[in-house]
Amino acid sequence: FLVSPFITDIVMKLFYKAKFDNEIPEYLKNFINQVCQENNMKYPRIGYIDDGSPNAFTYGHTKNDARIVITRGILELLNEEEVKAVVGHELGHAVHYDMLFMTVAELVPLLLYGIYEICFSDNDNNSKYGQIIGIVAYILYLLSNYIILWLSRTREYNADYFSVDVTKNPNALAQALVKVGYGLTTTEDSNKKHSVSKSNALGIFDSKTSKSLVVCS
């Protein structure tokens, strides 16, 4: 956990050719500076990936060691207000300590599943009480996964609210999400092997969700 941001840095550079502290548009730099000052946080490390898939994501421990990564697709597909809305969403994750919160929360189902596996690793030597504990742990594991999904969705809503609050432009975020959804769908098939669109764990939108958006629109 302590070294995970540094490992992610290496993965981003090695597989996605991310460039950190790369020059970003002046309007975006000014926007990030303003949000950081208003929320008492350090200016994050900004990563840039030369990938046509529009995406952005945040990782790190706290708001003071956050990394925000954006792709070329974000800057090309969205207008200035929409780019600020997307980056505002990612800054919201950092301000609310979402990276740390979700990492700790996700340890619960891992622990419960570990208990279940221990209790059923050797059925011949397990007592009835051990098996009962294992069954209870597995049920709690299943329930905890749904709770994690709910928590994750709640954090996303909070990040959306933060973005709207700092940009004063709810339409920009809504339009950006639609454009990102369509952009991920149209670029997915032509993407190279190591494209950020292939990772659903990272990003403001995953490619599977974007396909649903296109079908519904």
Positions of predicted regions on the chain:
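Hydrophobic or amphipathic, alpha-helical segments that drive membrane association/targeting
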Residues: F1-N55, E106-W150, G181-T185
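Divalent metal-coordination and catalytic microenvironments
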Residues: D9, I32, I70, H89, ...
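Alpha-helix N-cap and coil->helix boundary residues
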Residues: Y27, E82, T103, T154, ...
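An active-site-proximal "capping" alpha-helix that borders the catalytic cofactor pocket
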Residues: I32-C36, S152-N169
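Active-site-proximal gating segments in proteases and membrane effectors
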Residues: E38-D65, S163-S217
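Active-site scaffold of zinc-dependent metalloenzymes
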Residues: A56-E80
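Short alpha-helix carrying the canonical HExxH Zn2+-binding catalytic motif
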Residues: V69, N79-V95, L100
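Catalytic Zn2+-binding segment of zinc metalloproteases
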Residues: L91-L110, P170-N171
